[in-house]
Amino acid sequence: MPILGLKTPGPSHPAHFDLEPLIRPNILALQPYRCARDDYSAGILLDANENAIGSSIPSLANGVASQTLSLLSDSEIASLNRYPSPTHDELKRSIAKLRGVPDEQWVFLGVGSDEVIDMLYRVLCVPGKDRVMTCPPTYGMYKVTANVNDVGVLEVPLITDDGKFQLDEQAAFEAYPDLKMMFICSPGNPTGTLIPLDVIRRVAENPKFNGVIVVDEAYIDFAPEGTSAVKLVNEFANVCVTQTLSKSFGRLGYLVAPPPLIQILTNTKAPYNVSLPTASLATAALSTEGLATMSRAVATLNINRKALIEELKNTKGVGRILGGNNANFVLAEILDSEGKPSNQKAVEVYKTMAESKGVVVRFRGSERGCEGCLRVTVGTEEECKEAVKQLAALL
């Protein structure tokens, strides 16, 4: 069903899904904040009570451009005292082209994907009433944001057989009724495991599930080609995908979703949530040269990931490498003297490495199915070798 007279309603499949009843009534009736800059962006701008004298950044006043500012055009630098574009359509079009959706109407921008996740809660979930589903071990901000918004969380743990992590479809099926959202992290954090697209498709098609599936793909650029759920967004009205430039590009989050949901989010967001420098640098990162640079970086990190896994496997005191290894990190078990995964030993190693060795990793042993685990981000070749060296010395 088109929302607010949308010209591009998006996919109509599955037949049982209707977005409009899911939106909070006050959000559905909301009249979005509008400003003169929505219609006019050039000329003598006396509409927004800005500082017309110019930016107060010292490097600009002294005529010295920093490395970051040097990537901005002269006109962009001259406009730092102005409010940024409320829409950033050029950037959205670049993302749409990169990810394979029709146009900018399918893209919503946020300051990191955490803002996007928070916005989804705010437009879909009634505080004190609605619930969402998460599948631990998973990204902790789903639950934090639910708590902030007074939304209930139903946890359906991933199946953790043999150190692998997959969605428990039967348990999820039994929990479907009355859920507003289901969060699927793929590749997972901290698991690094991809959830197969066929599994997500079955959830989307299930008539018992009337909510929105949110597939968090923060690490998708490190996974094999063709594994992104964005292709499902083109087909299903109840699937959306959060991604971020923070892992393989820079610092920006976005949602790829059918236009009705994008419009609702756009109506609700703060008018100038993404700054001009962020949008300009993100646009540069998505240029032909920027994409080539990103591809080289991802290829290098994937090579380093493979080498790191092999070195960890050959390190005494390190147990299994868990999960799917489709992200820019590795999840490794730390063993005690009896050869069993140990949270106590993992915490000891984690603290000593950070405080005495200058190597900071992440303790993940408190997560379901991750007993005794440290999560090691894939760094440069030298950083990975140093991390393994210091780890081996402590084991």
List PLM regions with ranges.
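N-terminal "arm"/small-domain region of PLP-dependent enzymes with the aminotransferase-like
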Residues: 2-86, 178
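PLP-dependent enzyme catalytic core of the Aspartate aminotransferase-like
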Residues: 198, 342, 355-356, 366-395
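Conserved core of the PLP fold type I
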Residues: 78-208, 219-244
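A short linear hydrophobic-aromatic micro-motif
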Residues: 105, 240-241, 317-321, 359-365
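Short acidic/glycine-enriched loop/turn segments that link adjacent beta-strands
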Residues: 249-250, 326-328, 368-372
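PLP-dependent aminotransferase class I/II
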Residues: 238-315, 320-322
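Conserved PLP-binding catalytic core of the aspartate aminotransferase-like
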Residues: 302, 315-356, 378
